[in-house]
Amino acid sequence: MRHGERLDDLFGEWYSYCKNKNGKYRQRDLNMPPDLSPLNRPLGEYQNDTALTVLGHVLAQMVGRAMLVSGRSPDMVYCSPALRCIQTASVAATMTGRPFKLRIEPGLFENFDLYPDKKPKFVTVEELKHSGFNIDDDYTPYCKMEDLFAVSESNEMYNDRVQSSLQYIANKSAPGRGTVLVAAHASTVDLAFGKFHSRFLKEPRQTTPENLMNISIPVPYSSNVTFMRNSDDDQWQYIREALPPITYRNFSNRLNHDFIERCNAAQQ
C-alpha cells in the first residue's frame, strides 16, 4: 500500500513556520498533528522526511480496519524507512488488533531523483524504539540503510532495487506463513504489480521515468494492490479491489486501473 496523506503535500515547508517562540513545533491547522511527540527530532529533519497529517493517520486506520474485517490482517509488516511509511504501517497494523513488529526495508525507498539536494535524514531504529514503535531487531534487510544514496541510481537500478526487495520479502513469506503488509510509496505499488502479476512472469514490467511523473495521481494515498500465492504452483494471483475503497467528496484512494494494469511500461 501507499502511505497516507503527507504534511508537505498540503502545507509545503510546514517545518519552517510551524514554530512557537521557543522554536518548538506548533500546530497551525487541525489537519496537522497536535504535536510530534514522542519523536524528538529537529524540525529541519522533516524537510526530506515528512510526517503524516491527521487525515493521513485516519486513512491508514481505515485500511487497517478493512484488512481486519476482510480476514486479511497481516502476520508480517514491512515498510520503507520514510517516516510517513513507518507511521502508515504501524497505524494500519495496529487497527487489526494483531501483535506485530515493523520490519524496515531500505530497499523499498522511492527513487533518488526526488531528492536532488541531499539524502533524507531518516529516523534511526533506536529513536523509533524509544518513541514506542515496535521494531523487529532480528530482521536482516535486503538493502542496508548505508547503501541508500551511496551511488547515483539509474531508473533501471531503481526498478531492480525495489522489485528485488519485494521478491526478498516474498521469499521470506513461504506458502502457509500468513499475510504480509508492505507500506511504502506510490511507485512501490506500481512496481509490485509489475513484479507479481502473472502476465509478467518472464520479465517484470518496468516503471519508466514517464510513469513516475505524477504517479501520485493514479496511485493515490493509501491505495493498494493485493496478491495471493497459489499453493499448487507457487505463482501469484492478483485480487482486484480486495479491500473496499475509501471515498470522501473529491477524494478516493481507488487506483486508476488503466494505469496500474497496463501491459507494458510505455503505456501511461
Regions found by a protein language model. Give the residues of each.
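Conserved beta-strand termini and adjacent loop/short-helix elements that scaffold enzyme active sites
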Residues: 1, 105-107, 239-241
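Beta-strand elements within well-structured catalytic alpha/beta cores of enzymes
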Residues: 1, 78, 176-188, 192
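Active-site-proximal alpha-helix that buttresses catalytic centers in soluble enzyme cores
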Residues: 1-100, 104, 159, 219
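Histidine-centered active-site/metal-ligand motif
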Residues: 3, 84, 185, 245-251
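Acidic, low-complexity terminal tails and accessory targeting/binding regions
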Residues: 7-19, 30, 98, 110-129, ...
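Short glycine/proline- and acidic residue-enriched helix-loop micro-motifs
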Residues: 41-51, 132-156
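A generic secondary-structure signal
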Residues: 62-69, 164-172
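GST-like fold's C-terminal all-alpha helical module
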Residues: 158, 166-171, 178-184
